[in-house]
A protein has these predicted regions:
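N-terminal signal-anchor/first transmembrane alpha helix
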Residues: 1-39, 113, 191-192
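Transmembrane-helix boundary motif in ABC transporter permease subunits
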Residues: 31-35, 80-115, 127
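Generic hydrophobic transmembrane alpha-helix motif, especially the helices
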Residues: 56, 60, 101, 106, ...
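Transmembrane alpha-helices
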Residues: 75-91, 126, 180-212, 259
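Glycine-rich helix-loop "coupling/hinge" segments at transmembrane-helix boundaries
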Residues: 118, 129-132, 159-160, 209-251, ...
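Non-cytoplasmic
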Residues: 124-128, 132, 136, 140-148, ...
């Protein structure tokens, strides 16, 4: 009797396209210093110019190449959003794991904290805090980590609640293993895909939020290559030089959409795998 072959499902075209976009952005972020060593260099004699052979996306009013600004801006936007997603994921796991596994007052305390944070408009709070404390990219990242962490906490807690009474957990409990060992060595590996899928979604939200703060002058300093800052610097040139405004806006939208598509796809795969167990 032949064993049925395992069906390998290929990702849809939208996911492949999203992964291609993310790969291009990652390459730009990683190799920006070599690809565009002088992205912020000004040529006041050139000034505003439309797309052409030497400048595929044109130049802004300071004579800076818009495409080079986008490539260099990826090196600021991507690591910043990645730090927010990773930081909030770390806090979410540290709080959500014991909340879901131990329950009781630990769970109640964690959920009250999450409810309090969810009652606050994240971007508005980030704008107020950054404005009061003087702004800065590092501060913006730190504030968003704290504001995004409750989402990860709830996702991790929910995943742990689904795993808490599985046979492998009960077997580990019968061996008198410590709660910490069970959570970290047995439960967490089974919920890691869920946490990772949620991190992709947080990555997208963080990218847009950091760009918004930079657009308002509360993120990277003036003159620094960043998608939000480039959009802000050229917003008054929409009619005279639309590409200088459209290009960074499209970069933000395309990257955030790609992250959302991949995150949703990962969620679907993780959820499907959980139902078939």
């Amino acid at each position: 009797m032949t064993r049925p072959s395992r069906v390998v499902t290929r990702p849809p075209v939208s996911v492949v396209t999203a992964l291609a976009i993310l790969l291009a952005v990652a390459v730009a972020a990683a190799f920006a210093p070599w690809l565009v060593p002088d992205a912020t260099g000004q040529d006041l004699m050139l000034g505003i110019s439309g797309p052409g052979p030497g400048h595929p996306l044109g130049t802004d009013d300071l004579g800076r190449d818009v495409l080079e600004l986008l490539v260099a801006g990826a090196r600021t936007a991507v690591p910043g959003a990645l730090c927010v997603a990773a930081g909030s994921m770390l806090i979410g796991n540290l709080v959500g794991l014991p909340a879901g596994y131990l329950g009781g007052w630990v769970d109640a305390l964690a959920m009250r904290w999450a409810d309090l944070m969810f009652s606050l408009p994240a971007l508005l709070v980030a704008i107020v805090v950054a404005g009061v404390l003087g702004g800065g990219y590092g501060l913006a990242i730190a504030v968003l980590v704290v504001l995004f962490a409750p989402t990860d906490t709830r996702v991790v807690r929910g995943a742990v609640l689904e795993q808490r009474h599985r046979p492998y957990v009960e077997a580990a409990q019968l061996k008198n293993l410590s709660a910490w060992r069970i959570m970290t060595r047995h439960v967490w590996p089974n919920i890691a895909p869920v946490a990772l899928a949620n991190a992709f979604l947080n990555f997208a939200y963080a990218l847009v939020s950091l760009a918004s703060l930079s657009f308002l002058g509360l993120g990277v300093p003036a003159g620094s290559p960043d998608w939000g800052r480039t959009l802000s610097d050229n917003r008054t040139q929409l009619l005279a030089n639309p590409w200088a405004v459209i290009a960074p806006g499209l970069a933000i939208i395309a990257t955030a959409a790609a992250l959302n598509i991949v995150g949703d796809w990962l969620y679907e795969r993780v959820d499907r795998r959980g139902r078939t167990r």
